[in-house]
Amino acid sequence: MVGGFMKRRNFIFGALAGLGALVDGAGLLVRQEKFGRAPSGERLARIQASRHYVNGQFVCLEPVEMMTEDLPDEEKPNRIETIYRVLFGGDDGRVPKEAIPSSKTDLHAIPREQNVAIWMGHSTFYLQIGGRRILVDPVFSDYGSPIFFINRAFRGSNVYTAADIPELDVLLITHDHWDHLDYATVMALKPKVKEIVCPLGVGEFFEQWGFDLAHLHEEDWDTDIALADDFHIHILSSQHFSGRFLTRNNTEWCGFAIVTPRRRVYISGDGGYGKHFADIGRRFDGFDLAMMENGQYNMQWHAIHMLPNETAQAAEDVRARILLPAHSGKFALALHTWQEPYRELLKESAGRPYRMVTPRIGETVDVENPADFPNWWEGMA
C-alpha cells in the first residue's frame, strides 16, 4: 500500500515537473527577441488615440468574425481539427512533391528607371517604381513560424537571400504575422534599408530590434506618407487581424498604395473581401498593378482571407490593370491543394477587365508591358 502511494506520488511529482519544464520552455521561447514586445509609452498613446482601436484592440472597418459559421451544421468541421490538419496534417496535395520552379533575376542589374515587380514567393515582392527600390513583407527563412517544424517553405521557393537584395529605398510591412514579418530576414536586411513604412504598433518591433526610428514611418489607415514630392505611400485598411503569439490585435494590419506621377501600385496585404476595395479603387482612380492576396483560404475563415472569386472581384473593384496574385506558392496554411489558388483565380478572372500575370519566383513583370507567363504549376505534383 505504501509502495502504491509512493508510485502515485512520484508519478504526480514527475508530471508536475514535466509540466513545469514545458511552461519554462515556453516562457523562454516567447522571451526571444523575434517575438517582439507589446507597444508601450508614446506609441501606445498614439494607438489608443486611433479611431480603429476599440476596447483595447484594433478592429476592422466592418464587424467580422475570424472564424465564420457560414456552413450548414452538418458540414461544419471542428475548428481544432481543422487547425491541427493545417499545422500537422498529411500531404493531401497541399505541399508540392517537386521543387517550385524559379528564374532568379539579378536585382542589381535592373535599371532603376525600369518599373518592375518580382514575386519572391508567398507575399514577398521586390518592386522598382518611380526610380525607387521597394521590398514588401520579406521572408527568406525556411519556416514561416517561430518553431522550426511548423510551416516549412516549399522546396525551391527560397531562392533569394538578403545578400541578393540591393540597397532599399523603402521596406514595407503589412502586419506582424510570422509569414510577413520575419525577424531573421529583416535583421539581415537592416544595413540596406533607408526607410520603413508600417501600420500602427508594428514600429515597436523595429524599435526593439535596433532600427533607426528617424527613418520609421508608422501610421494609421488613410495616411499619406510623402517620402518625396514625386513619391507617396498611402497606408490603407484591410480586413484581417494581427498577433505573433497569444495577444491579438494590439498592432494594426494594412494594405498600401504606392503613387508616383506616372504609376500607381496597390498591395492588398492579407484580408477578407469588403467594400473597402471599391472605395480604394474610386479614391485612387485605379491602379497599374495590384498585388492581391490569393491563397490560404477556407470557408471557415474567408472573412479574413479572400476566396479566389473574391480576389477576382476585389481586383476589379480596385480597378487594376494588372493583377499579380500573392499569398501562395510557398507555405501551406490551409487545406486546399497548393495549385488550387492559381487554377481558381485564373478561372474567376476570365472576362474581367484586368490582366492576370503568373510569373515564376524571380521572374520580372514589366509594369509597362508585362510578358505572357505560362501556367507553370500545371503538370506538377
For the regions a protein language model found, what residue spans apply to each?
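Divalent metal-coordination and catalytic microenvironments
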Residues: 127, 137, 175, 233, ...
